[in-house]
């Protein structure tokens, strides 16, 4: 296992104007970024970063800074597979030449971090790429964008960083992997930390969710304990239906059966046959009840894969006219999937989960949760319930969104009723 340095060392180095190396989860980008605070940018730091990275230097910023500077999204519909929120590129209006030199880019970076800067201080497009970080940082999204802003804040600096991916010195056509990053960090006396460790550090020192109430909920699948939560970063409420003793026989919270279910009014409440959400929720409750120990976490604010109820109905309207579920979202100027699972991960940790068997047919959900220090030991498939109304939707999820849904090609619309089974 690669030796990592402490978060405390990384924060101290950031405060001192040094760069650090930050690695993410191997199931995500599996890359290491050089990171330093934007307000500490110098020509020397920028030149060092350009020398050892791809050279595509980005400046992660807190959302309020992006708003103040009028930094709009680079593209109306974010199609980046990791949800990196690129904004329009910029250069400083004053004090630079072409904008591309290390000195020019350092000037632009410092100006982006300056609390007194305004939108008119920049020209667009430019040679520096600002990124909009999620509110809540790595506790909401386990990315380098959020890690850079978190490290700057923890160092007592403005919420602005500079990042770029480190290129392998062995194979310049590839990105450096963990073992090589350790060698690189040692050669240049840089701290090497992981986003997972930063998440764990923040989780120990901060809390962004609040447990509000608990009550007994008898259901047709048996009795559950309903635990209600709020989050300071979201104006929504979430509820976890808990069965049994989550700590388990060894008191360690391992091997818990978990379903993280996205709110779906039409499917869960109205019984809509356009999706498979209602049957998935019912199956998850039944499976947890049979297990005698587990959690069904009901995530509010995830309606329509995070786009909201009205947008979801608009997407349905487009689907009625022939679009599939992905293209309908994109036509509305919305991402195919806008959900994040950071709050859900915090709730699971608060409930005592440390490792879990995740009930899902969506491999992306595993990646969305795995970066938060929650060890997913198994992905447990849910039954697929296809019918004439949702078969095209399910095939789109399989073919365009990577969901693990087998057997759909055997569905026969001429046969009444539902088709499916465990996958």
Swiss-Prot record:
Mg(2+) 2 binds at residues 29, 144. Pathway: Cofactor biosynthesis; riboflavin biosynthesis; 2-hydroxy-3-oxobutyl phosphate from D-ribulose 5-phosphate: step 1/1; Cofactor biosynthesis; riboflavin biosynthesis; 5-amino-6-(D-ribitylamino)uracil from GTP: step 1/4. GO terms for cellular component: cytosol. GO terms for biological process: riboflavin biosynthetic process. Its EC number is 4.1.99.12, 3.5.4.25. The record marks 127, 165 as: Essential for DHBP synthase activity. Residues 205-423 are annotated as: GTP cyclohydrolase II. GO terms for molecular function: 3,4-dihydroxy-2-butanone-4-phosphate synthase activity; GTP binding; GTP cyclohydrolase II activity; magnesium ion binding; manganese ion binding; zinc ion binding. The active site is at residues 337, 339. GTP binds at residues 259-263, 280, 303-305, 325, 360, 365. Residues 1-204 are annotated as: DHBP synthase. The keyword Glycosyltransferase does not apply. The keyword Transmembrane helix does not apply. Keywords: GTP-binding, Hydrolase, Lyase, Magnesium, Manganese, Metal-binding, Multifunctional enzyme, Nucleotide-binding, Riboflavin biosynthesis, Zinc. Mg(2+) 1 binds at residue 29. Binds 2 divalent metal cations per subunit. Magnesium or manganese. Binds 1 zinc ion per subunit. In the N-terminal section; belongs to the DHBP synthase family. Catalyzes the conversion of D-ribulose 5-phosphate to formate and 3,4-dihydroxy-2-butanone 4-phosphate. Catalyzes the conversion of GTP to 2,5-diamino-6-ribosylamino-4(3H)-pyrimidinone 5'-phosphate (DARP), formate and pyrophosphate. This is Riboflavin biosynthesis protein RibBA. It comes from Mycolicibacterium gilvum (strain PYR-GCK). The gene is ribBA.
